[in-house]
From Swiss-Prot:
InterPro entries in UniProt: NA-bd_OB-fold, Ribosomal_eS28, Ribosomal_eS28_CS
Localisation per UniProt entry: Cytoplasm
Gene: RPS28C
Lineage, uppermost ranks: Eukaryota, Viridiplantae, Streptophyta, Embryophyta, Tracheophyta
BP GO terms, sorted: translation
UniProt KW keywords: Cytoplasm, Ribonucleoprotein, Ribosomal protein
Molecular function via GO: mRNA binding; structural constituent of ribosome
Top-level taxon in the UniProt lineage: Eukaryota
Similarity field: Belongs to the eukaryotic ribosomal protein eS28 family.
Keyword set includes Cytoplasm: yes
PROSITE patterns per UniProt: RIBOSOMAL_S28E
Gene Ontology annotations for the cellular component aspect, listed alphabetically: cytosolic ribosome; cytosolic small ribosomal subunit; plastid
Protein's UniProt name: Small ribosomal subunit protein eS28x
Length: 64
């Protein structure tokens, strides 16, 4: 694997997505930089949680 593991803090929970609402879309801020991206998270998540991202370049599409 070429990419490094990155840690990101959940800044805002945007909403639920997926066919049955099993995925939560969140806005995260990387701890090592000032970058913000949107990610889809499976499982319980709330603001302030720290996520370990194996793939840090992939960004989720916006909710409709």
């Amino acid at each position: 694997m070429d990419s490094q593991i990155k840690h990101a803090v959940v800044v805002k929970v945007m909403g639920r997505t997926g066919s049955r609402g099993q995925v939560t879309q969140v806005r995260v801020k990387f701890t090592d930089s000032d970058r913000f991206i949107m990610r889809n998270v499976k499982g319980p998540v709330r603001e302030g949680d720290v996520l370990t991202l194996l793939e840090s370049e992939r960004e989720a599409r916006r909710l409709r």
